[in-house]
Amino acid sequence: MQISGTTTKTLMAIIATILVVAALQATRSISMPLAFAFFIAVLVHPLQSWLERRLPRWLSLILVLLLLIGFMGVAVGALTLSAEIIEPKVPEYLDRLQQMGETLRSWAEERSIPIPQFNAQDGINQVTQQAIGGIKTLLSAASLFILIVSLLVLLLLEVNQYQEKVKQAFPSRSSDRIINAVSDTSEKLRRYLLVMTLTCCLTGILTASWCFIWGVDLAFVWGLVAFVLNYVPTLGSIIAVIPPTLVALIFQGVPRGIATLLGLAVIQTILGNFVDPRLQGKTLQLSPFVALVSIVFWGWVWGIPGAILGVPMTISIILMCREFKATRGVAILLGEVED
């Protein structure tokens, strides 16, 4: 029995894909930070190039790094402020939950329905354990950030030399195609990340404003949560609506809870289904199914950071596959249908 050349190539491609995924999972401690560094480099490279035309290269690199560190400082400051806002509210929330638990327990006992007793002290202990876990996570994130910055510096130092290296490594026709494909992919990916950041900012601002209008506690925190979670398309938008809705429902009553839910759902729907696609263009859109599979798959490969990078990674693969005839079918299967 003979196997055709096409079948052999297909089998080889499948085997190679499996091996690459296994390698990425086995080397997650270095491959995941490298992916983060790559996406950051794609974002900041135009700024670095602009600065290099006016300043020495070493100074432009320092300014770009200072800008990134400043951005991270703002993010850490926002998280710290959120923690300071939440901390004094915890006892009040636990007391309220204790009262609701007792009311529910009394109602259930009258109807002979077994229900476990809620203890506020147990809640405090759980919050403390979560806080300790959060501190460990922050320490891990700090070491990860240092590694990402180190890789980013090396990437930015080498980025201006990659075209010459490609020309020396491949024949002129192939090297031109590779350089054009990488440049086009980087430009489109940069647009995607910038538009995504813009829509996340708008979502966070509108979420915080809506919660503030309806008197929902921790409005700033819910805006920050919405900003972060909307980097995870589809799934993040759904999760971002749940916490403020529950807080409004429990502490402000059913009418405000429903108003909060409806308002936040409208914000997510308009920005996710109308504003973002109009800014991105259809060629950079994923179907909700592919987006969800991307999040789950890359989350399995790299954990939570992989879930955050899932959609950008998939879009990068689609853009690169679209540039070559042999892989264009993969791009069509993963992307939206073009009119």
Where are these regions (language model features)?
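Hydrophobic transmembrane alpha-helices
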Residues: 20, 37-41, 68-71, 152-155, ...
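Hydrophobic alpha-helical transmembrane segments of membrane transport and translocation systems
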Residues: 257-339
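Membrane-water interface of transmembrane alpha-helices in multipass transporters/channels
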Residues: 29-36, 213-225, 252-260, 286-291, ...
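Anchoring transmembrane alpha helix of integral membrane proteins
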Residues: 1-80, 152, 314, 319-339
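Juxtamembrane membrane-interface segments in integral membrane proteins
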Residues: 47-55, 62, 75-147, 159, ...
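Short amphipathic alpha-helical coupling elements at transmembrane boundaries
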Residues: 49-53, 85-88, 92-99, 103-106, ...
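Membrane-interface starts of transmembrane alpha-helices
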Residues: 55-64, 116, 175-178, 218, ...
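Alpha-helical transmembrane segments and their immediate interhelical loop/hinge regions
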Residues: 9, 140-250, 254-262
